[in-house]
Structure formats: structure tokens, C-alpha cells
Amino acid sequence: MKKFLKALVSIMLVLATGCSSKTVKTSNSTKESSAKTFDGNYYNMINNGRSKNSEKFYLNFSNTKDLVTIGSGLQILSTKHFSTNDYYLSEGLQLTPTDYNNLLKRDSAGTKEEDRKYPDTLQIESGKTYEGLQSPVLVSNITEQDYYKKSGSSYALKGISVAIILDPKEQIDGKLSSPAITLSDEKLRSYAQQCVKKAYKYIRSKKKKLADVPVMIGIYRANNNEISETNGNYIYESFCEGGSVGTLKNVNHENVYFTSTRATKLDPATASEFATIKSNLKKASTEAAGLVGQANYIDDTIQTMKITAHLNIKTYTELLYLTSVIADNINSKFTQDFNIKVLVYSQDELMAVIIKQKGEDAKTSILEQ
């Protein structure tokens, strides 16, 4: 029963943080769900099937926090161009495994131009030195999201978003170096611009039905888990349409741990308030208690925070009391209004979940037997 409740709460977390609001199955006989389950900040969904690149994408990022933030960040960037009121989101299915190979693979060093299998690659030419790096591989993967408009009972593709994921590594004796290499901002921007131009040209020329479809291209810098546990972030975006490559714009997405030096510098008020909540919890607890927060910022403004609370409770009453302390504090101490979710653990077991939606009071769910 408890496993069932945990699964139910996991679903509630997804619903509370908001990803979409409908599920629509697209097939020869399209069916649309009438139930609205998420808030209106994100997209209604249609199901056209699974991307053939999903397995490779999962293998690349399953051990990193990039697995989620690449997709969620791409949706956030897409909302500027494809309104959540008018568009439906689908798994990206326009680029095939062949397309991914053409963009991500490269010919071996010394291959004659007329013999090249991958003339459209986004990668640096094999064997070349770039920024002092030996034969680097700069793009690790690509992922896609499709955006549809509904007309009657049918759906028409009206836009796609593509994330180009940079994870620069040298290739030495056929093996990729680890950890990843850091490029200068100037070279990073120059290379990102090249990737956008090449990718958009490829999509328009090789995918004929996409020739007139707007394409939003985001450049994502993957996280290096050997340096930091925080996920990567989008650094550039370009909206391309009508055959014209859009201006490469800086993107300011950042994920920050609380408490940390970076949190104090970026958002001193919230950092101080978080420290107060943490102190109040410790004072209320008879045993060790701790809080760790991770917040998402866009343009230096906090959007969401996930808090993990580690308690050492001995009774059910103590669990109720300490979760109420946390809920009361996140209601009253934060001066900025943003979405918050709190996972409450005791002895490494999930015991409660607290959700605070922007503009609302916190709501607590206790996982009982």
C-alpha cells in the first residue's frame, strides 16, 4: 500500500509542478482527453509515438540531472514562440536516426571531400586542433520537440524545437577525454552560431516538409558531474523561419543550490530566508535535521525551488509536527512568490510531500501505511 501511495505522490508532484494539461493520442483515429490535469503554464500534449533517439538520449544522460532539464528548458524557450494556448506538444519525430547520424557523426581524419559520408556534421573535422584541443567532439547529442495546432479533429505541425547539447571533449587515441573541456565564451558563441546555421540549413534542405516550418534551436551546455552535481543549462537560442537564421540570443537559465556562495551572491534575500527556515527546523527538532534546496532561475529571477528535508523522527506525531513547521515557514518566510515542493525523508524513507504553488498556501500529504 505504501508503495502505491509513493507512486501516487510522485504523480502528484509532476501535476503540481506543471508540464501540460491534456493528453491527446494522435493516430488514424485521434482521441482527445477532456480532463485537465495540469496548470495552464505548459503545453497540452499529443502522443505521436516515441522518438527513435530516446534510447540513446537516455543512455547519454540517465546518470545526470540534464535528463530532465534539457527537455523542460526547451519547453520554456519554446513558449516564447509557440503559445501554450494555441499549440500542442508532441515527442519530436521529424528527425530520424539517419538525420542524427548525419549531424553528430564525422568522417575519419584525412577522408577526401568527395568520399565523406557526413558532410553535414556539426562536429569539428576529425584530426583537427580546435582551441588547442586535439580532435575534439563538441556536440554529444540532439533532441527534438514538435509543436502542433489543432483544426477540427486533426493536428498540423506548425513548429519544432531542437536542442543541440554541447559537451566538449578531446578525442585522443580514439577515446573521449573526461571530464569535459571548457571553451572560451567567444569560441563557444562562434561555434554555437555555426551549429545553428548548419542545423537549420540541414532541416530545410533534407526534410522537405519542414522547409516552411519555424524552428527554434536552443544550445545547451551539459553538466559535468565530475565537477558539479548541478545540471547544465541553456546558453543560447535562435528562432529560424522563412529560410532566415535568427539572431543568436543569450539565454540566462541557472540552477542554484541553497545554501551556497552562488545563492548568496545571486539572491541574498532568498538565501537568508532559506537559512532562517533551516535554522527554525533544527530548533524544532529534537534530533538532527537538515534542508537542501535547489532553485531554478531565469534572467536572475527565481522560478521554482525543490527542497529535500532529512529528519530523524521517532513517532508519527513528531512527523506531523516537523512537516507543519516546514510548511508554515515556507508560507511565511519567503518574500518572493514561487513554486516550491518539499520531499520529507526520515532514515532515507520518503514520509511526506509539501507542495506550494505560486499564489497559494502550502499543502502537505503524509505517506501513511
What is the role of each PLM region?
Residues 15-18:
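C-terminal motif of bacterial Sec signal peptides marking the signal peptidase cleavage site
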Residues 182-209, 317-339:
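Short, non-transmembrane amphipathic alpha-helical segments
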Residues 20-22:
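Bacterial signal peptide processing site
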Residues 135-170, 285-311:
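Short edge beta-strands and adjacent turn/loop segments
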Residues 185-289, 296-298:
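Acidic, serine/threonine- and glycine-rich low-complexity intrinsically disordered segments
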Residues 39-148:
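Post-signal peptide N-terminal segment of secreted/secretory-pathway proteins
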Residues 2-10:
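Sec-dependent signal peptide recognition
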Residues 262-267, 274-369:
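Hydrophilic extracytoplasmic domains
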